[in-house]
Amino acid sequence: MKLRRERFERRNGSGKNSQSSSSWMVTFTDLITLILVFFILLFSMSQIDLQKFKAAVDSIQKEGNGLQPDQTSIEKKNTSPSDTKKQEDQQDQLLKKVNTYIKDNHLKAQMTAKRDERGVVLVLQEAVLFDTGEAKVLKNAETLLHQIAVLLQTIPNDIQVEGHTDSRNISTYRYPSNWELSAARASGVIQYFTSKEKLPSKRFIAVGYADTKPVKDNKTNEHMKENRRVEIVIKKSKTTSS
């Protein structure tokens, strides 16, 4: 009778082996549950940190303008009324000097001078310096550029040379657009000053504006002619020569 009972228990999975198997399954299930809870907690914590990080970034972005004022604002704050008046007087004297030089050297037909927020500006029309659609300085223009170089040698300020075009599109192998043409013209003028006249290259910067800064609308040939120009900007400086 006892033997039959043992056989029955073995067939039906009862006994110690069955109990051990069930206990193992319970332990494994508990372990999986704990791991799942652990990762849920980690995910929740990471979400909280991410929200805090986003909030901090938003706060910095809102205050960004106050943390990084532009250079112009700094200069304005650091410039006293007396310094501003002095700089204005220096610019007036420089413009007067330039106009006197232009008159004495009979250059009025080839260039003009003006003053704006950049400094004192020498304006040269395209026909004086280049062939249409080209950036190589004309041989005939070298006399004019030499006279300008003589003037610049007496002025310690930095110089910005700007190329400008009219609104007509250009598309050549050398100059795919007005941007390349205007920049090449500015660079060509600087190349003459630094290579032929031996002016320090560190004083110069070349800028090409294409047709983005016209002085007239481009509705007539005469207006387009005025827009095709090179501007030599004698930049403002505390050491402006009188």
Curated annotation (Swiss-Prot):
Gene3D superfamilies linked to this entry: OmpA-like domain (3.30.1330.60)
- What are the Basic and acidic residues biased-composition ranges? 1-12, 73-89
**Any idea where the OmpA-like domain is?**
117-238
| Membrane topology field | Single-pass type II membrane protein
The record's section on InterPro entries has: Bact_OuterMem_StrucFunc, MotB-like_N_dom, OmpA-like, OmpA-like_sf
What keywords sit in the KW lines? Cell membrane, Membrane, Transmembrane, Transmembrane helix, Transport
Output a single Gene Ontology CC term carried by this record.
bacterial-type flagellum stator complex
Keyword Transport assigned: yes
Its main subcellular localisation, reduced to a broad class, is: membrane
Which top-rank group of organisms is this from? Bacteria
Task: Give the Extracellular membrane side ranges.
Answer: 45-242
Q: Which Pfam families match?
A: MotB_plug, OmpA
Which residue windows are transmembrane per the record?
A: 24-44
Q: Which family does it belong to?
A: Belongs to the MotB family.
* The protein's role, per its UniProt record: May be involved in some transport function.
- Name-wise, this protein is Uncharacterized protein YtxE
Species the sequence originates in: Bacillus subtilis (strain 168)
